[in-house]
Amino acid sequence: FNTANDPRRARVTLRMLLTHTSGLAGDLSMGGPWGLDRADKAEGIRRALGTPLAFDPGAVFHYSDIGFIILGALLEKITGEPEDVYVQRNVFAPLDMSDTRYLPAAKACGQHRTIGTAIAFAADAPRVDECPSGTWSTDLLARIAPTAHDEDTAGANPDFGRLLRGTVHDPTARRMGGVAGSAGVFSTVRDLGLYAQALLDRLADRPSRFPLMPSTLELMTTPQQPGHTPAQLEAANNAARQALANTPDATNPLLAPHYPAIPGQDLRGLGWDIDTALSRPRGMLFPIGSFGQGGFTGTTLWIDPGSDTYVVVLANVIHQRGGPPVVPLSGEIAPQPARALGRYGS
């Protein structure tokens, strides 16, 4: 983890990785053809561990896929299992998330062909009556929304220009074989609803099969960035209420004026977003203290324990490049259930 011999590396903690305050840059170097002809997870991890720090550890919030690639590698090291196997056994299966999984090309079964590290349906390939345990059936491809045409490295990528469907869009995760701590999961609204409700039930100490203790979820869903204090959440909500009161048109799609509510005060739980520049999917009515996460392809999940509510938006907004961004759409959707609940304004 310290190939650059940077003494600051010794100050990086798991808390910093989980709150995106480690000082790592956002994305891996994609230089060279690694992982294009065939997946190379080891090279992705090597690059993640050797990436120079862009900021001092603990100094600023900077969303980093690299940090979560490292966390995924740590999970595999500690458990001795591939990440997709571990998560399937400990999260997806117990919550009955039958339509949720990683789709690594190496474990595809059925009528398909592999092009580099991408999957494509092939009607002329032999049919498979029953897929072995540990694989996934390419019959799923018909149910998966396409994301975008593969734009990764013209001339070196055999899949370049082809439509990605059932292959993770994130190029780093794709080069690593479709399973990384930063990306790779496919799901449905139903399954994400099961996940969110189980999480809410566990937080509220109701019967739940969610695989974490309430005390652990408390760390994930309250501010945990370096230097956090209990007063930050109250101050952020006060600032958001004041901003909303000063907004002439509360239905404006630009929503509240500030994300985060207090400029320079980014609030992150362990993994979850609470109040940062990425929090627009929260909308203008759910309080700061609700939490969620967005995805580049047009996916968001936002959860509000105070009202026992969750909002799921799944869109393939980058299917046509240059289309409208999904973040404003998610932010417009979230206030609708908040208003309907009658708890958070009109």
Write out the residue ranges for each language-model feature.
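Acyl-group handling in specialized metabolite and lipid biosynthesis
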Residues: 1
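Structured C-terminal helix/loop/strand segments within mature extracytoplasmic catalytic/sensor domains
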Residues: 289-346
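Short, surface-exposed loop or secondary-structure junction motifs
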Residues: 4-288
